[in-house]
Each structure stands twice: as structure tokens, then as C-alpha cells.
Amino acid sequence: MSFRGINTTVIQIRRQVFTEVARMAYANVKGEQANHLMRKIPYTIIPGEEGKLRKDIFLERAIVEERVRLAMGLPTRRMDEHNSVVSGLEDASIADKYYDPPLVNVIKFACNRCPEKLVKVSDLCQGCLAHPCMEVCPKKAITWESGRSTIDQDKCIKCGRCVTVCPYNAIVKTERPCAAACGMGAIHSDELGRAEIDYSKCVSCGQCLVNCPFGAIADKGQIYQLIQGFNRGDRIYALVAPAFINQFPSLASTGKLKAALKAIGFCDVVEVAIGADLCTVDEAHDFLEEVPEKLDFMATSCCPAWSMMAKTAFPGLAKNISMTMTPMVFTARMMKQADPDARMCFIGPCAAKKLEASRRTVRSDVDFVLTFEELAGIIEAKDLDLASLEVDPAEQDLIHASAAGRGFAQSGGVAKAVADKIKEWHPDMDVKIASAQGLAECKKLLMLAKAGKYNGYLLEGMGCPGGCIGGAGTIADPARTAVQLNKYVKEAPFTDPEQSAFMSNIHVLKDDPDFEL
């Protein structure tokens, strides 16, 4: 389970790191002054002379140092080599700098070396006469010793049947939280028992980093580079994903959100749900053209973790992933065409969007990617009094996207929007859809599709539980966000994506003069 909505110590430290990195960037200093500020951050976050978290203040500060480096887009340091915390800072100070892979990293000396998977009998065992645990074990791994059940770990296959039948809940099944959260099976143990990521499988969804109770996993960020752009006077647009709802309770209205984003340095704010409207229409066209004549089924393309998983784990199905641009790319490209000298910053719930933005085909459209958590750190660093922010009456709301576009933020929303559009064009057509959330479930969906169970279907996959609102970069509890999102969808100024004032741009953005609505 993740800890969104619970203000744990791990989350507090993560957000403090974002805030202090942003403060350092706003200070706009170079050289030794910048080095000094960076070296100071661990002492600001972990003050005093005694460790309170791991009983070793030097270890606590060393871990914070690595988190600071990653938040600035710098790589973690090797443990067997001497390397200053400020190593590479000069390169990171360039506003055009983008981080090098890998995006998601394990801070090795922060890892607790949790067991990969274990079933064990606790002290709650009552030594009952029925001992159903022994009876159901398919490998006869449970025996009776000293008046209680004992599990032979060499025989145990971790099936969990004993856990289910124990009347005292005395048998527990534990698993490394980061590995349990990884739907790709990309996390295993290194030779020292620490978590290690197999990057040939990892799709950077970020679920491991929000599920690690020790805060040993973190992703790279562009907070520092973005603020360098502000300092330089660049015109930078904030492209805000619809999952922003409920993430910032102090910003009770979209007008307040826009005011806050402009106060920290953005020139204007655009809702990415506009791009979702364009995506809906384009994907509906794709489905009608491709299925079933050319493809057995078509899968949506909006979630980069889902599409990357499909192409990595099921290379033969890569052709079934829609070629439609994601809402982020549609929106960024549209704004770049309207303001060619400006730069674009996507602000959303997703770690995988950072990976998407680094692709060669997207890099020229999207300059920066921030998560909502990182944005919260920047707002904190700016010391904004959110309650007294003045809202321009002419710009009180984000009112340029449809209800369907706003609904992309929730699992099932993309497929529903596309299917509804197809049914509008072809009322007699039965559009069958299926969706999955979380990469493990997404893999099951594609396995069934590969076996021919979903021929003629439109499939939607969301890498995070709940969809975008459950992304690794969110702040609020996804269940509560879902309630607020549904309200936000109902408040949209129109329902049909084709009513968008920006729909006429679609053929230009696709570079397809023959595209017709």
C-alpha cells in the first residue's frame, strides 16, 4: 500500500527536500555560493547532533544528500568512491539540462534489506488441536514443534493457504513493499540483500518509491532547472493535468491555482484536458480505421507506463497501441505553435511522464515535468500566502476542456470518452471496452487480449491504481480525489470534446492535412 493522504515521516522528508532545492534555486547563486547552499540542505532538514530516525545522524544526512541530488536531476553516488555531494552541480545549473537515465533510483544505504517474500508463524499461534495450517499446506512444509506450528522455509512455496485458514491470524505473509508494488517484477535483491531495479523491465511508474516505508527509492526531478529558467526570464507555461483536483486544499479554486502558478514564475496556465479532448477525437478515428480490418483490437496510448509495459512485455502487440499523441504532447505542441519561443512545463501526477518527455520525439515539445508533490515544494519555498492570493476575475476558472477530457484522470475515463465519441458518430455500433488499473492487472488484460479474448475491443490500461489520480506524484488520498474529480467533471462547461475551441488545430498538430472531423 502507498501512503498518499498520510503525512508520514518519509513523505515529510521528501517534501522538505523539494522545498529546500527550490529555495536554493530561487536564491539564484552560482559557484561556491551554490555549493555552500547545497551542502547546507541536509543540516536544515536533519538538524541537531543526534539521529532521531535511524539513530545515526550521519546516515540520515547522507540519505538526504542523495535525495537532494536526485531532486536536482543528478545521479546517485557510488558508495565505494569518494565523491562530493556537489559533484555535477554546475551541469545541473543549466536551465536546458535534462536528467540522464535511470529515472527511478534505489539509495542503497537507505534500503532496509526487507525479505523478498516470507510466510512465518508469529507468537500469536495458540497451538490449536485443529491445526488447519498443516492440513492445507500442499508441500507439507508445516510441522508441529514445541506446541506450535513451524514452517520449513526450504519447502514453503509462499502460496498463503495457511495464512487464510489460521483462526488466530497467527501466520503472516510478508513481501518487500517495493517489489509487491511493482507490477513489472522489476525489483529483486542484490548480493547484499538490498533492493535492485532491473531497468530492462522498469517503466518508471514510480509505485515502488511511494510504497517504500524507508524512503530508499526516489526519482530524478527538474525543480532546479525549471527555476533556473524562471531566473533567466524564460516564458514558461504551466500545463496542468486534470488530476490536480484535491491535491492542493489551500487552493480552493482553479483561479487560486492559476494565481499561485503565476506567482512562482509561470507566464500562464493551460489545462491538459484540452489535449485530452483532441486525443479523444483522434483515438476514435484511429479505432474506426484500424479495428477490426487491420488490428484485432486497439489499446489507448495516454498512460506512458501502460504503453511502455505493453511494448516491453508484449512486443508483438506494439502495433496495437494507438499512435495518437498523449494529452500532454497535444497540449504542449499546440502551445509551442502558438508561442514558439516559450517553454512548456507539464505538471501532473506521474513519474512516467518524465520518461515520456525525455523521448526524442517529445523532447522538443515538453521542456520540464513536475509532479504535484514537487510543485507543492516550490510553492512552499516561495513562501506564498495562499489565503491572500488575488485572483484575476477574468481568469477565475479553467474552462476550455470538456467533461470527457477532465475524466481522463480516472481509470476507465479514456476508454469511455473514446467509446462515447464513436457511438455518437455511429449510433448503431457496439463499442466494446475493457480496462485495467495497476501494471499487474494491465499485464493480465494484455495476456487475455493476446489469446484473442478481446478481439474488436478498445482496451485501456492505467499503470497506477485508480488511474492518474493514484499516480506516484500525487499528494492526496486517491479515493477522496475520485469524489472531487467526479464533481469537477460534472462542472465542465461542455460535455462533447468536439465542442473544444481548439479542435480546429488537430490536423496541424498531427501534421496531417487530410485529417477531417
What are the residue ranges of the model-derived segments?
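A secondary-structure boundary/capping signal
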Residues: V121, D152, D198, V240-A241, ...
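Iron-sulfur cluster-binding cysteine motifs and their immediate structural context
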Residues: A130-Q153, R161-D198, V203, Q207-Q222
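Iron-sulfur-associated redox domains of electron-transfer enzymes in respiratory
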Residues: M1-H82, D219-L517
